[in-house]
Amino acid sequence: MTKFVFVTGGVVSSIGKGIVAASLGRLLKSRNYSVSILKLDPYINVDPGTMSPFQHGEVFVTDDGAETDLDLGHYERFTDTAMSRLNSVTTGSIYQSVLNKERRGDYEGGTVQVIPHITNEIKDRIKRVAKQATPDVLIIEIGGTVGDIESLPFLEAIRQFRKDVGRDNILYTHVTLMPWIPAAGEMKTKPTQHSVKELRSIGIQPDILVCRCDRPLSEGIKEKVSEFCDVPVEAVITSQDASSIYAVPLILEQEGLAQQVLKFMHLEQRRPDLTQWQALVHQLDHPSQTIEIALVGKYVQLSDAYLSVVESLQHAAVAQGIAVQIRWVNSEEIEAHGPDRYLADAAGIIVPGGFGIRGVDGKIAAIQYARDNQVPFLGLCLGMQCAVIEWARHIAGLEDANSAEFNPETRNPVINLLPEQQDVVDLGGTMRLGLYPCRLLPDTLASRLYPQETIVYERHRHRYEFNNAFRPLFLESGYVVSGTSPDGRLVEMIELPSHPFFIATQFHPEFRSRPNDPHPLFAGLVGACLADNGNNANHHDSTPAEPLVSEPLSS
C-alpha cells in the first residue's frame, strides 16, 4: 500500500517546502523506493496558466499538457520522474469539480458544503494519484502557510486522511523557520512553537520538524524544540541555507530525514546511492571557470519567471565542468538604449518565452545583435518567433513583417495563429500544450545536438506558429527549418548554418532538462560559448560567479 507524507509550512511563506518535498523524494528514490509528489495550491485560479509571471513565477508544463506550479519542475528534476496533471491541484479546480457535480445533480439535492464535499474532493485527488502512479511513497506538499484561511480546507482534508488510510500509513512533516537574532546572539524557537501550536489546533500533530536556519541547530535547541513541540529530538531536522538547491538533499540526508520517515512508516531502511548527486554538488562548488550568458526577457525582475531556463543552463554547465552566470537583461531597456551596452562581451544570448507585445522589439534587437556579431544564440518559443520576425525584416525583405499576436492587421504575418486556435475565445488551458513529436532534418545542427534521434519529443506552450505561406521565402534566403511536426506541417526548429551556433525552437526544452542529464540544446549552447575564442566570451577563471540560484528557496 502507498504511504503518504504530508509537507506543511509555517511562520513565513517561501520557506522551502517544495525543495524539502523534492529532496525527500530524491532521498527515497536513492533507496529504490518509487515516489510521486503532489502539490495542493490554495489559490482559487483553476491553474496558473493565465497568472502573471510576476505574481506566480514560471508556469511549468507537464507531458500531458497541464499548466502547473513551478514546484512540479523541482519535483521532476530532483526525482527524475515525470509528473502529470494529477500532480497539481488548486482550490479553483476543486471547487470547479464540486460545482460541476452539483449542477449535474450528483449530490441529489443535498446542501453542498466545505465539509464534507470540498474535503472529500481533496482526498479523492490524493487517492487518484496514488492509484494511477502506485508509488511506494506519495509526498503531498500543501501550499501556503499554516494559519492562512485559504489553506484550511486542505489541512482539514489531510487531518481526516489519517483516519481514512490508517495512522501507520501517514506522516506529517512541518517546515518552519528558526531565526537567528543578532542583537540577542541566539536562535529563537518561539516562532516554531507557535506554528506547531496553530497546526495542533487544527488537529494535526507533526511527526517531523524541518527547521530552516542560517546555521546549524545546537543539541540544546533541538532538545528544546522536541520538548515544546512533542516531536522526538532525532526528528528535529536542520535545513541550513545552502549555496545551491541541489545541496539540500545531502544536508537532509546527513540530518537523517529519510531514516526518520522510513522509521515512522515502518519501511525497510535501505542504503542510499547518492554517488551521482554528490558528484553533481561537488562540481557545482568547484567549476573550472565561469562564463556569462545574457538572458533577454521582460520578466527579469523575478528570476523565478525563467526558473527552468536557469536550471537548464546550470545542468549544462556542470556537465562541462564550468559555471554559468546569468546576465539579466530587460528587453525594454534594449528598446530604450540599444543592445550594445547590455550584450557586449556576453558569451551567449538566450531569448526565452513570453506573451504580449511589450518588450518584443528589444528581443528582436538582441537577436539581430547575436546574428550580426556571431554570438551563440538559443531562442525558446517566443524567442523563435522573434528570430523569424528579425530575419523577415532584415534579410528576407519584409520590413513590416510581424506576428499576428502583436499586429493582427500586418500584411506579412510570418507568425500566425495555429489553425485550431482560430475560433478559440477562452485563454486558460486552450493553447497547444504538452508533449509532441518533432522530426529532425538530417545534416543540421539540430540533428547533431540530438545525435541518436530522428524523432524527439518536447513540451509545448503556445498559440501562434510559423506561417507556412512564408516558408519558401525563408528557405530561399538561407534559413534552415531543421525540425518539424512528423507530417511536416508545423515548424518546430529553425537555425542558421552560416552562424557558429544559432538555433531556436517553438517548444520549451527547459522543461525536460535534468541535473544529471542536461538537455542537448542547452548543452550545445554552453559548448558553443566555450568553443568561442573569447571574441564575445567573458571569462572569470579565478573568481567563480555567484550561484545561479541564490534567492530564498521557493515554497
Curated annotation (Swiss-Prot):
Record text on activity regulation: Allosterically activated by GTP, when glutamine is the substrate; GTP has no effect on the reaction when ammonia is the substrate. The allosteric effector GTP functions by stabilizing the protein conformation that binds the tetrahedral intermediate(s) formed during glutamine hydrolysis. Inhibited by the product CTP, via allosteric rather than competitive inhibition.
UniProt region (Amidoligase domain), positions on chain: 1-267
Residues making up the signal peptide according to the UniProt record: none
Pathway(s) it belongs to: Pyrimidine metabolism; CTP biosynthesis via de novo pathway; CTP from UDP: step 2/2
Residues covered by the Glutamine amidotransferase type-1 domain: 299-535
GO biological process: 'de novo' CTP biosynthetic process; pyrimidine nucleobase biosynthetic process
Keyword ATP-binding in record: yes
Molecular function terms from GO: ATP binding; CTP synthase activity; glutaminase activity; identical protein binding; metal ion binding
Residues binding Mg(2+): 71, 141
Residues bound to UTP: 13, 188-193, 224
Positions annotated to bind ATP: 14-19, 71, 242
Keywords assigned: ATP-binding, Glutamine amidotransferase, Ligase, Magnesium, Metal-binding, Nucleotide-binding, Pyrimidine biosynthesis
Binding site for L-glutamine: 354, 382-385, 405, 463
Note: CTPSs have evolved a hybrid strategy for distinguishing between UTP and CTP. The overlapping regions of the product feedback inhibitory and substrate sites recognize a common feature in both compounds, the triphosphate moiety. To differentiate isosteric substrate and product pyrimidine rings, an additional pocket far from the expected kinase/ligase catalytic site, specifically recognizes the cytosine and ribose portions of the product inhibitor.
Family: Belongs to the CTP synthase family.
Complex and partners: Homotetramer.
Protein name: CTP synthase
Species of the source: Acaryochloris marina (strain MBIC 11017)
Organism lineage string: Bacteria, Bacillati, Cyanobacteriota, Cyanophyceae, Acaryochloridales
